[in-house]
Swiss-Prot record:
GO cellular component: cytosolic large ribosomal subunit
GO process terms (BP): translation
Segments of skewed composition (Gly residues): 21-35
UniProt protein name: Large ribosomal subunit protein uL15
Residues covered by region (Disordered): 1-40
Length: 159
């Protein structure tokens, strides 16, 4: 068998039947939609309509709320930070900031700042500047000989 002899199995691919192309096609006139009524027309499905039965979105109670004052931090764990240092994506000698973490691809968009968490291990002596840090993360960095500076987030200029 050669590459130019490869073929699909018989019946593996077939052309879909064209609709509304005459009586002889088997799908002419009404195109298999029957006669009149809601389902014969466009935009048939009414979202959430369950045939008159009380829909699930009305049977279940409302829960919770959206807190407009919630803070959204970009999170970085010690293990990922150490891995980036080992891979030479971050220079451990320089002060590590949100900009450096973002450039290294460790965090996404910084909304209300960066929060350092203590999952994983840090061996490098680092100086890191973040807007929030867990007690475990601070203890681990200081044990490795580094320092954590918790600073207020920089105000984003509105305009």
């Amino acid at each position: 068998m050669k590459l130019n002899e490869l073929r699909d199995n018989e019946g593996a691919r077939y052309q879909s039947k064209r609709l509304g192309r005459g009586i002889g096609s088997g799908k002419g006139k009404t195109s298999g939609k029957g006669v009149k009524g809601q389902t014969s027309r466009t935009g048939v499905a009414i979202n959430g309509f369950e045939g008159g039965q009380m829909p699930i979105y009305r049977r279940l109670p409302k829960r919770g709320f959206h807190n407009p004052n919630a803070k959204h931090f970009a999170v970085i764990n010690l293990g990922r930070l150490q891995k980036a240092i080992d891979e030479k994506r971050i220079d451990a000698k320089a002060t590590i900031t949100a900009e450096i973490l973002s450039a290294a691809g460790l965090i996404g968009k910084v909304l209300d700042g960066v929060r350092l968490l203590g999952h994983g291990e840090i061996k490098a002596k680092v100086s890191i500047e973040v807007t929030g840090a867990s007690a475990a993360a601070i203890a681990a960095v200081e044990k490795a000989g580094g320092s954590v500076t918790v600073a207020a987030p920089k105000a984003v200029a509105e305009g």
